[in-house]
Amino acid sequence: MEYNFREIEKKWQKIWVDNHTYQVNEDASKQKFYVLNMFPYPSGAGLHVGHPLGYIASDIYARYKRLQGFNVLNPMGYDAYGLPAEQYAIQTGQHPAITTVNNINRYREQLDKIGFSFDWNREIRTCDPEYYHWTQWAFIKMFNSYYCNDEKQARPIEELIEAFSTNGTQGMNVACGEEMDFTADEWNAKSEKEQQEILMNYRIAYLGNTMVNWCPALGTVLANDEVVDGVSERGGYPVIQKVMRQWCLRVSAYAQRLLDGLETVEWTDSLKETQRNWIGRSEGAEMNFKVKDSDIEFTIFTTRADTVFGVTFMVLAPESELVAKLTTPEQKAEVDAYLDRTKKRTERERIADRSVSGVFSGSYAINPLTNEPIPVWISDYVLAGYGTGAIMAVPAHDSRDYAFAKHFNLEIRPLIEGCDVSEESFDAKEGIMMNSPRPGAPEGGLVLNGLTVKEAIAKTKEYIKATGLGRVKVNFRLRDAIFSRQRYWGEPFPVYYKDGMPYMIDESCLPLELPEVAKFLPTETGEPPLGHATKWAWDTVNKCVTDNENIDNRTIFPLELNTMPGFAGSSAYYLRYMDPRNHEALVSPAVDQYWKNVDLYVGGTEHATGHLIYSRFWNKFLHDWGISVAEEPFQKLVNQGMIQGRSNFVYRIKDTNTFVSLNLKDQYEVTPIHVDVNIVSNDILDLEAFKAWRPEYETAEFILEDGKYICGWAVEKMSKSMFNVVNPDMIVEKYGADTLRMYEMFLGPVEQSKPWDTNGIDGVHRFIKKFWSLFYDRNGEYLVKDEPATKEELKALHKLIKKVTGDIEQFSYNTSVSAFMICVNELSSLKCNKKEVLEQLIVVLAPFAPHVCEELWDTLGNTTSVCDAQWPTFNEQYLVEDTVNYTISFNGKARFNMEFPADAASDAIQATVLADERSLKWTEGKTPKKVIVVPKKIVNIVI
């Protein structure tokens, strides 16, 4: 019988659905294993061959764990809210819900063809009201919580209100936006609105004024990773920095726990380090600086308190509120012009860019230890969100301060004995202090001269604490997350506004569903798209949405017009997969207790400082409320690499429609243009197909070499815009899903990026055919016999079992595919058709090529799926070699090799080697001085 992959794959995909093969339920008798992929955003382009890489890798592992007897949860869903669907809706007028469903259906069709073991009964879509019910619920919980630093957890906001009513802020140690100081009487005397404004300083979900990346053309705030070179990643529209009142999440309150949690998870060292750097813990001191001729005082944070004697200027972030206060009238025009320029740069660009820019404010601060006046500058190398948004600049011992001082000709004052700062700053935290204070300074006060840097830091901290000039402080780079977007296609906030302050709708009224709007653009008055909704007001009496015309600001109030960002729906989706049809809770306690957290999470490294931070924060918050039993959501994380596209180029001669072949292009002034890889074969362009590809090329002319047009090529990201996308449907149709699955694994290690190249795919397809031929000959005769296997056959099998078991545990799937090929070749050479061997071979191959393995498993007479078989264990006795190959050396130089029985004695080996005629040749009749036998390795004859 011929291997007909199309019929086989279609047959078994239907059987899996009909038999609910991959449906899973909690089973206390089995150990659980939760496998999860970062779910996809369903774009209109569908999947290309790069997308399934991680899915295939995780699916192999999921199937493997099931064969080991684990109860495996392997769900899939869709991150369905997002900017692309909304942009498409703006361009076409088609509702995002329609395009999203169409895209999801296309994704599902493609995923099903590849044969994944997903439990589709647990499918979730973040745009489904039944799903975002629980996103809204979590937001309400965050709004009604504060973070207690003493207990290191979130607590109900009612407890904080009670504490304020009784003691004011006395004795409070809580996470907040700014330090506040008031008595119980002062609190109790405030109006409801005033109290609500104060509570906003403590809530975990709060409204705050933040600097954002604002894109006027898109009418929304963008995340840092959505902005490239000052323009939006999608559409290329200009982006500016702007202060806006936004919903935020107090992620910073969890900074230390996010840092500590990294010690408990199995992630790569590089990814952990990325998160550590993003969280950015630093121990230092806050110091207070007064402004000359003013009663204004401001605070700076420094990790080098020892360098305070070397401060020669101060720098404010352009966004700092101090800029307006400290800019003198003489400097205002220059400062305003500088601020206008910096608005066009994102924080990420400012961090990466080492060019120097700045402007003098006109004001001076006073060094609290020397009483010297210090000029206050403004520069975008200082960020408002880190520390206090103001720094003391010590150019002798900080490279960015040094570059600034050199550029603006400011004083550089070294503080370390023997350091040379003529060409660069001395940043090392080592050496002996000097100039602290400088010679001739008034006596008294802090003296650091002669101390080591470490001693000086400690002494300075003690001094400023004792004198009230500052305090010891641990600072974090991690910022609170901006949580609102001025878009339509996102989760609505369960928020209405009373007297300008936000209030939550009752949890019993969730979900608050996204309303219909006539337009997806901002309103004429600049409101977000939800401003177009005519039925978007909250009736607090009847607890329902009502028409806007009914708003009376007594019982009916306007609803929030912003929507939640893309990461809202992806921050706790792993929990919802556990219990997706529960209408009473995000996840029931019993189900949560069983599945706990994700054992294996697979996704890209690009989410290291976004999704993976937000999910960990979200989970820790829910853990505080007793919702998630595990504090960390993802125990083991594997980052799959990227399958890159192999792009092709044609070269158009400037100002013509003539295209010159690759090796002739240097003779002309040309422009390289991406060309569709589907009309190129082995870098040779199909000329007629190229002319038909796009209207502007219909009259194209060509300068050929040897009658052919040779295209250029490059390995790049697989993308529609580069015309290098390979559709997996084409591969499945031509070779089958099992071939695609194995070939993607064969391309290289899962974690590494590698170019897509179909040159080796025929070899993988031939392997599956050869595997099939162990069961059927060319005439369709069934070959399998129920006879005892030979030692050689069992050796080939058990060598494979050992290799593949180890490889799967290490995600070394590429070497597993090689091992399968070697084993099948060996069994073919041995003409092995023994059921004892082939049955176990099927089980080991099944995670990689499930369709063909199900078919052959069935032919062996099994009545259940191969998924429910048992993973075989290798037997070491079959792996012991009968003979050992020895290298025979003379005076340390290898001359030839000899085979000996594995249990041969050294004396017997020596005698046999010396008697060999080749030894007689190399000894030239001389008696050896010494013969050294290294067991199982080498025989060295010393002459």
Curated annotation (Swiss-Prot):
Residues the record lists as binding ATP: K720
Protein origin, superkingdom: Bacteria
Broad class of where this protein is predominantly found: cytoplasm
GO aspect biological process, one term: leucyl-tRNA aminoacylation
GO molecular function: aminoacyl-tRNA deacylase activity; ATP binding; leucine-tRNA ligase activity
EC number: 6.1.1.4
GO cellular component term, pick one: cytosol
Compartments reported by the entry: Cytoplasm
Motif 'KMSKS' region in this chain: 717-721
Motif 'HIGH' region per UniProt: ranges: 40-51
PROSITE patterns linked: AA_TRNA_LIGASE_I (PS00178)
UniProt keyword Nucleus, yes or no: no
Catalytic activity: tRNA(Leu) + L-leucine + ATP = L-leucyl-tRNA(Leu) + AMP + diphosphate
Keywords recorded for this protein, A-Z: Aminoacyl-tRNA synthetase, ATP-binding, Cytoplasm, Ligase, Nucleotide-binding, Protein biosynthesis
Alphabetical list of PANTHER family matching this protein: LEUCINE--TRNA LIGASE, MITOCHONDRIAL (PTHR43740:SF2), LEUCYL-TRNA SYNTHETASE (PTHR43740)
The protein's name: Leucine--tRNA ligase
Native organism: Bacteroides fragilis (strain YCH46)
